[in-house]
């Protein structure tokens, strides 16, 4: 992420103002493929959704995504989920939202927006186009 992002983010100058826009497409899964160790945390994180302390649980377990030294204060980000888990029923999306929000806020993202998986592709495409044109 950092390798490509840092060189492509435009910075405001005295004569030009920029708003960078990033669209991130994620599969919506919490664990990496074939990584059984990752799934041990899922029950704890699901419980944290019910209690309402997902961010605290992520921090307590030391699961925060490491911050990279990139200033996103002039950047708006849209994160799109493309694959809802049948077993999660929205839970994985909420946990991913907590992870990504925490991480991007620590890099001062100007605006963070999430798009839950849509059944119709054209709805997703329209939402992405609206985000870019804003």
Regions found by a protein language model. Name each.
Residues 1-21, 26-31:
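Von Willebrand factor
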Residues 7, 33-37, 82:
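Short regulatory "switch" loops immediately downstream of catalytic or recognition motifs
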Residues 28-32, 83-86:
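Solvent-exposed loop/turn segments at secondary-structure junctions
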Residues 32-34, 39-50:
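Scaffold/interface architecture of coatomer-like assemblies
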Residues 50-134:
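Von Willebrand factor type A / integrin I
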């Amino acid at each position: 992420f950092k390798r490509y992002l840092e060189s492509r983010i435009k910075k405001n100058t005295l004569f030009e103002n920029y708003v960078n826009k990033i669209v991130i497409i994620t599969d919506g899964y919490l664990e990496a493929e074939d990584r059984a160790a990752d799934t041990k945390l899922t029950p704890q994180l699901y419980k944290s959704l019910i209690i309402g302390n997902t961010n605290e649980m992520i921090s307590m377990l030391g699961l925060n995504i490491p911050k990279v030294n990139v200033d996103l204060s002039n950047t708006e980000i849209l994160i799109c989920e493309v694959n809802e888990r049948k077993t999660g029923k929205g839970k994985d999306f909420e946990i991913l939202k907590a992870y990504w929000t925490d991480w991007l806020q620590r890099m001062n993202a100007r605006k963070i927006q999430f798009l839950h998986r849509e059944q119709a592709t054209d709805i997703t495409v329209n939402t992405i186009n609206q985000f870019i044109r804003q």
